[in-house]
Amino acid sequence: MNIGQRYGWEFALAALLIIEILLFGIANPRMLDINILLLSTSDFICIGIVALPLTMVIVSGGIDISFGSTIGLCAISLGVMNQTGIPMAAAIPLTLLVGAICGIINAALILYTGINPLVITLGTLYLFGGSALLLSGISGATGYEGIGGFPPALTDFANLTLFGLPMPLMLFLLCVLICWLFMHRTHSGRNIFLIGQSSKVARYAAIPVARTLYLLYSLTGIASAIAAIVLVSYFGSARSDLGASFLMPAITAVVLGGANIYGGSGSIIGTALAILLIGYLQQGLQMAGVPSQVSSALAGALLIIAVVGRSISLHHHQIRDWIQRWRNQRLSS
């Protein structure tokens, strides 16, 4: 298989991304400013940080829709720890631990109950979200009021640049590299595809299914914690609703990036390109004066188109055979 066949979908996404930027640039020349393009990634790049390990979860045949609440819980946990005087050098690793525990809870419930991951993570979505609100109330911040008072070392992070790139974008690129190397260049990563194709066969082949799922859901929790830390730095406060709007664009990016929603196939590079495609779509529409409700509707339509288009591309041989049989029947009649 040559590189064009292997990465054809990724090349198509890259071409669509360039076309999208050029079209929005015609409507608003500011969209072609490289500085605006780079700085605007901070508005949506945290979705990509979570979508990368979510890709691996979906490839394994699972799903996690609780990451939005995990982000809120991790953000509030960081705020409470800051309020109690715990230094950031300790609070940040503890926040990552909170995210990992959330992922472990998801994996444990899925493995030991045998219930569909969608149902389990729907339950933990409310569990983690309620816990975030409870912690927020204990800290004295009622409802969705934020917890502030973070040190400048944290709040300045999201505004820093490295080699001309915003730090959140650099962090995202680092996550892309790590996830790509793990998923496509390690034995454990290749096991993810086998588990997604058939977990029963994977168990018969002595693949550590349970250990792999614990790892994947933990990585999603840790990524949610990283996103929470970046969001707290970006907004300067911790709120329980910071990840509330991440669910639809993250899943859309994973599916648009080439992942089979039923498991067995997917691409980290595809997800990364899809995040940029969706993010710049929303940015371009906002700069064009399109209401946010319309951009949300377009994101939903994009998810449907991605699922249908990917399904057609995966089953084009069967579709072609069906069309040929239908034509033969018409001719014979």
Curated annotation (Swiss-Prot):
<feature type="transmembrane region" description="Helical">
    <location>
        <begin position="240"/>
        <end position="260"/>
    </location>
</feature>
<keyword id="KW-1133">Transmembrane helix</keyword>
<feature type="transmembrane region" description="Helical">
    <location>
        <begin position="118"/>
        <end position="138"/>
    </location>
</feature>
<comment type="subunit">
    <text>The complex is composed of two ATP-binding proteins (LsrA), two transmembrane proteins (LsrC and LsrD) and a solute-binding protein (LsrB).</text>
</comment>
<feature type="transmembrane region" description="Helical">
    <location>
        <begin position="261"/>
        <end position="281"/>
    </location>
</feature>
<keyword id="KW-0997">Cell inner membrane</keyword>
<comment type="function">
    <text>Part of the ABC transporter complex LsrABCD involved in autoinducer 2 (AI-2) import. Probably responsible for the translocation of the substrate across the membrane.</text>
</comment>
<dbReference type="GO" id="GO:0005886">
    <property type="term" value="C:plasma membrane"/>
</dbReference>
<feature type="transmembrane region" description="Helical">
    <location>
        <begin position="288"/>
        <end position="308"/>
    </location>
</feature>
<dbReference type="Pfam" id="PF02653">
    <property type="entry name" value="BPD_transp_2"/>
</dbReference>
<dbReference type="InterPro" id="IPR001851">
    <property type="entry name" value="ABC_transp_permease"/>
</dbReference>
<keyword id="KW-0472">Membrane</keyword>
<comment type="similarity">
    <text>Belongs to the binding-protein-dependent transport system permease family. AraH/RbsC subfamily.</text>
</comment>
<feature type="transmembrane region" description="Helical">
    <location>
        <begin position="45"/>
        <end position="65"/>
    </location>
</feature>
<feature type="transmembrane region" description="Helical">
    <location>
        <begin position="7"/>
        <end position="27"/>
    </location>
</feature>
<protein>
    <recommendedName>
        <fullName>Autoinducer 2 import system permease protein LsrD</fullName>
    </recommendedName>
</protein>
<feature type="transmembrane region" description="Helical">
    <location>
        <begin position="91"/>
        <end position="111"/>
    </location>
</feature>
<keyword id="KW-0812">Transmembrane</keyword>
<feature type="transmembrane region" description="Helical">
    <location>
        <begin position="70"/>
        <end position="90"/>
    </location>
</feature>
<feature type="transmembrane region" description="Helical">
    <location>
        <begin position="212"/>
        <end position="232"/>
    </location>
</feature>
<feature type="transmembrane region" description="Helical">
    <location>
        <begin position="162"/>
        <end position="182"/>
    </location>
</feature>
<keyword id="KW-1003">Cell membrane</keyword>
<dbReference type="GO" id="GO:0022857">
    <property type="term" value="F:transmembrane transporter activity"/>
</dbReference>
<keyword id="KW-0813">Transport</keyword>
